[in-house]
């Protein structure tokens, strides 16, 4: 139960990133528009006082502000899409539910425009509806409910005379009903909840703000490995605290208050729960990256320089720290704990210096410039000396502990990994043993990426042993184990089933010859990795980063690096000259190898293995040579959208030694057949 809840919280945390991703664009418009109307920038650029320029500045401020004014609705739509695998039907359901809930609450409580005029009432006008103000929390609740309706009813079957309303069309209907019902308990319970939240936040800030900001920074950083930090910081940024704007409206949340104060040009009081990240992300972590580079073995420094350099630059500019943090998190947990303490101390330091800095995305230089330097409303320059001190601390602490405790940070790994080896015929036996033996297997299945096993006793499963046998990851959901063996997962499942049925497994055709041992971790493909491989788009559609694919196996790159495409046409074409290496029996996935040796997996949609091949038409067979642009598979796009979790199609480089992918057209935007998708090295 606890692990199931943890998994759900992780999904919610990731779903919150979709609406949050909109904020930088809104913040950019708001920050530039506000700065152009301010005396500080006009002093240096007198020409912007021109009436036409000022009109544009006001329009930019309004365009950015409208996003922050409607954050609850945006969170409702974003959370619904994120938890429903990216399907737009969930967003429609969320919008329907959001307006129905607000309208019903307003009518039930008899809220009028006159009531809204009293800031203490807790009422507001939402999309023109006088109703109870539930804030971002209300949006998140509706988004989660819409996603539940989608996941529960998207493939529902109805009698033929109601067939038009079957499948995904049924989801908004159910959402209308459930949100109407939800409105009544929300109307009765939410005022008490809101009062409690306000009392908690006021007490927290009034009792000892210094301790509060330290604990916020410390805990938020510790939650990053679990993906729960988005849930933790949301109430601080969007609900805790209050401030009355010039129009008499009560604004809640540290980030929303900060943005509103920037927009109005008011005296800054917010930013306490954001500003501490600027010294860490712009100075501390890049210095840690330098320490990791300096402690790497000489023969590995060239590779480490590329990895750490790009991670440090990303942290400095954008405040995205995960690429750098995950490079030492698992091999040096003490360093990560110290990093979390320093993060908390950074929040405390800037609070004691009476700074008030905020951001729309993260604590990188871009937000620092737009919302700190340009508005010039606080002593933004104090971040620089604090950051330089942090850089020195991070560098010497990291360098000392890495050397002293012999941490295997990037570039310090042993030359030969202690990889387990198993011959091709031994592997299914070894996997079965690691799963606890035949008696422990309740249900055995597989798809193109993973072995899915429901076990009777999870304690009998040897997770490290599975990883030694080649699983790039092992996921646990209750008694359900998912071992990520990649394209050979189905073959392993088939052979395990034969063993459990008393049959002898001999010379699997999809694996290497028995005379060759399969070395799982240490594999010499240096010749292949030195080549440059051009991959063209196999589909027409919208490019999406793997990190946004709603499947942990792909988003965490357990299968390998790559990208995804949300198709607009139902065709898959060869992305290069090569050969068809493997076709999954249910036709939803195909493995290719290029003439230059690059191995590529194209997985059409998510959970499409459950369609059992329906909606797919093959035009090639295993072992067939293909030319770039040849038609490989036709698929019924409407059928997949109506019957599968998502139509988003991951395109994965399955060779672990190839990690340098250059996305020529970026990781977002539209792409067509034959356009260069990426270059792999």
From Swiss-Prot:
Protein EC: 2.7.1.199
InterPro entries attached to this UniProt entry: Dup_hybrid_motif (IPR011055), Glu_permease_IIB (IPR036878), PTrfase_EIIB_Cys (IPR018113), PTS_EIIA_1_perm (IPR001127), PTS_EIIC (IPR003352), PTS_EIIC_1 (IPR013013), PTS_Glucose_EIICBA (IPR050429), PTS_IIB_1 (IPR001996)
Keyword entries, A-Z: Cell membrane, Kinase, Membrane, Phosphotransferase system, Sugar transport, Transferase, Transmembrane, Transmembrane helix, Transport
Annotated catalytic residues: 447 (phosphocysteine intermediate), 603 (tele-phosphohistidine intermediate)
One GO term of the biological process aspect: D-glucose transmembrane transport
One of the record's GO molecular function terms: protein-phosphocysteine-sugar phosphotransferase activity
Domain PTS EIIA type-1: 551-655
UniProt domain PTS EIIC type-1: residue ranges: 3-414
Catalytic activity of the protein: N(pros)-phospho-L-histidyl-[protein] + D-glucose(out) = D-glucose 6-phosphate(in) + L-histidyl-[protein]
One CC-aspect GO term: plasma membrane
Name recorded for this polypeptide: PTS system glucose-specific EIICBA component
Organism ancestry: Bacteria, Bacillati, Bacillota, Bacilli, Bacillales
GN (gene name): ptsG
């Amino acid at each position: 139960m606890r692990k199931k809840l943890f998994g759900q919280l992780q999904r919610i945390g990731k779903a919150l990133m979709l609406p949050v991703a909109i904020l930088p664009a809104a913040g950019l418009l708001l920050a530039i528009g506000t700065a152009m109307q301010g005396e500080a920038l006009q002093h240096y650029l007198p020409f912007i006082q021109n009436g036409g320029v000022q009109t544009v500045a006001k329009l930019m401020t309004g365009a950015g502000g409208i996003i922050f004014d409607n954050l609850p609705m945006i969170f409702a739509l974003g959370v619904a899409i994120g938890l429903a695998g990216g399907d737009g039907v969930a967003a429609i359901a969320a919008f329907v539910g959001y307006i129905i809930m607000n309208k019903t609450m307003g009518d039930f409580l008899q809220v009028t425009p006159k009531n809204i005029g009293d800031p203490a009432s807790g009422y507001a006008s939402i999309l023109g509806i006088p109703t109870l103000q539930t804030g971002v929390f209300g949006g998140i609740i509706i988004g989660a409910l819409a996603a539940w309706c989608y996941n529960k009813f998207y493939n529902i079957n109805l009698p033929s005379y109601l067939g038009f309303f079957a499948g995904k069309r049924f989801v908004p209907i159910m959402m209308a009903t459930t949100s109407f019902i939800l409105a009544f308990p929300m109307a009765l319970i939410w005022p008490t909840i809101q009062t409690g939240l306000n009392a908690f936040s006021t007490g927290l800030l009034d009792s000892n703000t210094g301790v509060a900001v330290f604990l916020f920074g410390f805990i938020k950083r510790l939650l990053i490995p679990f993906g729960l930090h988005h849930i933790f910081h949301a109430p601080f940024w969007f609900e805790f605290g209050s401030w009355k704007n010039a129009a008499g409206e009560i604004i809640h949340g540290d980030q929303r208050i900060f943005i509103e104060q920037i927009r109005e040009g008011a005296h800054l009081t917010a930013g306490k729960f954001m500003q501490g990240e600027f010294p860490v992300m712009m100075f501390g972590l890049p210095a840690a990256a330098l320490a990791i580079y300096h402690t790497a073995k000489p023969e590995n420094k060239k590779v480490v320089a590329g990895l750490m350099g790009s991670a440090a630059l990303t942290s400095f500019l954008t405040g995205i720290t995960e690429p750098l943090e995950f490079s030492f998190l698992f091999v040096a947990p003490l360093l990560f704990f110290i990093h979390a303490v320093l993060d908390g101390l950074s929040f405390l330091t800037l609070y004691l210096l009476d700074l008030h800095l905020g951001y729309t995305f993260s604590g990188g230089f871009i937000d620092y410039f737009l919302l700190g330097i340009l508005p010039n409303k606080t002593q933004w320059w104090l971040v620089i000396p604090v950051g330089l001190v942090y850089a020195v601390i991070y560098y010497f602490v990291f360098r000392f502990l890495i050397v002293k405790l012999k941490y295997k940070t990037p570039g310090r790994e042993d030359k030969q990994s202690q990889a387990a080896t198993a011959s091709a015929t031994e592997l299914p036996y070894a996997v079965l043993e690691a799963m606890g033996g035949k008696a422990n297997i309740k249900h055995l299945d597989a798809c193109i990426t993973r072995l899915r096993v429901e076990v009777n006793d999870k304690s009998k499963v040897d997770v490290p042993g599975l990883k030694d046998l080649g699983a790039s990851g092992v996921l646990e959901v209750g008694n359900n184990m998912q071992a990520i063996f990649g394209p050979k997962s189905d073959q392993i499942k088939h052979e395990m089933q034969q063993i459990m049925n008393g049959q002898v497994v001999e010379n699997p055709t999809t694996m290497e010859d028995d005379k060759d041992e399969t070395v799982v971790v240490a594999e010499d493909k240096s010749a292949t990795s030195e080549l440059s491989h051009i991959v063209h788009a196999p589909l027409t559609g919208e490019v999406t980063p793997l990190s946004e694919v709603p499947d942990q196996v792909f988003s965490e790159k357990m299968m390998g690096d790559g990208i995804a495409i949300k198709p607009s046409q139902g065709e898959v074409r060869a992305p290069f000259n090569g050969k068809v290496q493997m076709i999954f029996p249910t036709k939803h996935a195909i493995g290719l190898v290029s003439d230059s040796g690059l191995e590529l997996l194209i997985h059409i949609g998510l959970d499409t293995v459950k369609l059992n091949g329906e909606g797919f038409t093959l035009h090639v067979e295993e072992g067939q040579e293909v030319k770039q642009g040849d038609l490989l598979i036709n698929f019924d796009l409407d059928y997949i959208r109506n019957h599968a979790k998502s139509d988003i199609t991951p395109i994965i480089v399955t060779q672990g030694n190839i990690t340098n992918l250059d996305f020529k057209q970026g990781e977002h935007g539209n792409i067509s057949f034959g356009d260069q998708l990426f270059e792999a090295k």
